[in-house]
């Protein structure tokens, strides 16, 4: 992706799942003086949001949650056939926002429901200065579009 050499990239997906990613990222950020960007899906965030109870993290946190109402990754797997039970049990389908939780934990909450709102929120989110409070950006996306994009991505990997 052509990142500058001084940019460090860490990744933690857990064991093909969501658990522990937020707690691990917050722990790493606590030991760092740099701004730390944490990007999670909604299910990963909601399953690990109690990590925010530990308020020892600093204001160098930039937390982005991609909220598409459930786990699009599961729906993009071959052989997945959605029905009401499958959507609820396997993908964690929901209609929940993280706004109240983020604000309650002292994070500055930003949101985007479309490209225009995302472009408006990004300058504050990526600003290189440490802010008074950690920043939280919730990006609402369309799950069907996300599923299709993932399927296309997986197809492109097979061609490579």
Residue locations for each model-derived region?
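Thiamine diphosphate
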Residues: 1-160
């Amino acid at each position: 992706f052509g990142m500058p050499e001084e940019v460090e990239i860490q990744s933690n997906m857990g064991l093909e799942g969501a658990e522990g990613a937020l707690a691990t990222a917050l722990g790493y950020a606590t030991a760092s003086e740099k701004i730390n960007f944490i990007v999670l899906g909604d299910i990963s965030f909601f399953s690990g949001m109690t990590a925010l109870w530990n308020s020892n993290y600093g204001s160098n946190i930039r937390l982005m949650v991609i909220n598409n109402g459930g786990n699009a990754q599961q729906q993009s797997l071959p052989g997945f056939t959605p029905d009401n039970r499958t959507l609820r049990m396997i993908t964690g389908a929901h209609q929940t926002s993280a706004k109240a939780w983020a604000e309650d934990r002292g994070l500055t909450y930003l949101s985007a429901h479309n490209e225009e709102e995302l472009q408006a929120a990004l300058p504050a989110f990526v600003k290189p200065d440490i802010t008074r409070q950690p920043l939280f950006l919730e990006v609402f996306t369309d799950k069907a579009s996300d599923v299709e994009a993932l399927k296309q991505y997986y197809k492109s990997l097979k061609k490579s």
